[in-house]
């Protein structure tokens, strides 16, 4: 199992890493088949591990995965994160549903508007126990650059659908549509 081999290698390197997940898009994507997402305690921890990896482990790993998949170190992107809401309880599932929204503020809206929207969202107490979200800020220069990336996480598609029904029964969809454009309207890129 390549995942177990990778985990063993990372453990032997002594990297300070908070976790890693492989997420696969629900719809085919032109530029990738999956994303290997790594969570770091700091940018310094990420840079130290990444430098060690590139200098001492990258070539051997490429041989190990040859014919299975390939990756480009030029496509390793760092985001800072801010947790918007923690789950009421952590899911014990090994799989999750992720929704990424790459958003820009509409005219008249800004981070203060987003703050108010988040306060309204966080006041809803009936969302599923395992839902949580965070805001991501690219620490690189994507083109086009979003004002922020909104990431929702659920343990299942069913929990997501239930929460969306609750969200849609409020005034929050209208507030979101007035505040931001994410994709062509408010579109998410969905991952398992």
PLM-predicted stretches and their roles:
Residues 1-192:
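Short S/T/G/P-rich N-terminal loop/turn motif that feeds into the first structured element of a domain
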């Amino acid at each position: 199992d390549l995942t177990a081999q990778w985990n063993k290698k990372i453990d032997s390197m002594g990297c300070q890493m908070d976790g890693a997940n492989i997420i696969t898009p629900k719809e085919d994507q032109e530029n990738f088949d999956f994303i290997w997402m790594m969570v770091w305690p700091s940018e310094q921890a990420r840079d130290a591990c990444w430098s060690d990896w590139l200098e001492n482990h990258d070539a051997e790993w490429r041989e190990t995965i040859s014919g299975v998949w390939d990756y480009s170190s030029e496509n390793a992107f760092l985001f800072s994160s801010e947790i918007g809401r923690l789950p009421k309880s952590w899911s014990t599932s090994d799989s999750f549903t992720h929704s990424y929204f790459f958003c820009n503020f509409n005219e008249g809206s800004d981070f203060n508007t987003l703050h108010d929207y988040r306060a309204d969202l966080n006041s809803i107490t009936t969302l599923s126990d395992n839902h949580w979200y965070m805001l991501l800020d690219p620490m690189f220069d994507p083109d086009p650059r979003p004002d922020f990336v909104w990431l929702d996480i659920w343990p299942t598609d069913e929990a997501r659908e239930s929460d969306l029904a609750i969200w849609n029964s409020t005034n929050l969809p209208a507030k979101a549509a007035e505040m931001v454009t994410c994709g062509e309207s408010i579109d998410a890129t969905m991952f398992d």
